């Protein structure tokens, strides 16, 4: 399962808000909504976020194993 938890940690560490992503950097509010709900994003979006946040992919997402219930 993909988690965007590192993305929110990176935002906090870089002192960047979602508002700034949208209005200062022109990032899509729809993509932020998708990420909040654990939906897929494109590699192009990952590349854009890495550029804005000056981080690697592991600063945006992480993979965790799903537990069988």
Protein language model features and the residues they cover:
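Short amphipathic helical patch at the helix-1/turn junction of helix-turn-helix
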Residues: 12, 37-40
């Amino acid at each position: 399962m993909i988690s965007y938890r590192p993305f929110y940690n990176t935002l906090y560490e870089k002192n960047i808000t979602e508002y700034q992503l949208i209005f200062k950097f022109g990032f899509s509010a729809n993509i932020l909504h998708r990420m909040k709900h654990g939906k897929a994003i494109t590699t192009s979006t990952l590349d854009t976020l890495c550029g804005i946040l000056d981080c690697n992919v592991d600063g945006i997402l992480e993979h965790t194993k799903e537990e069988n219930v």
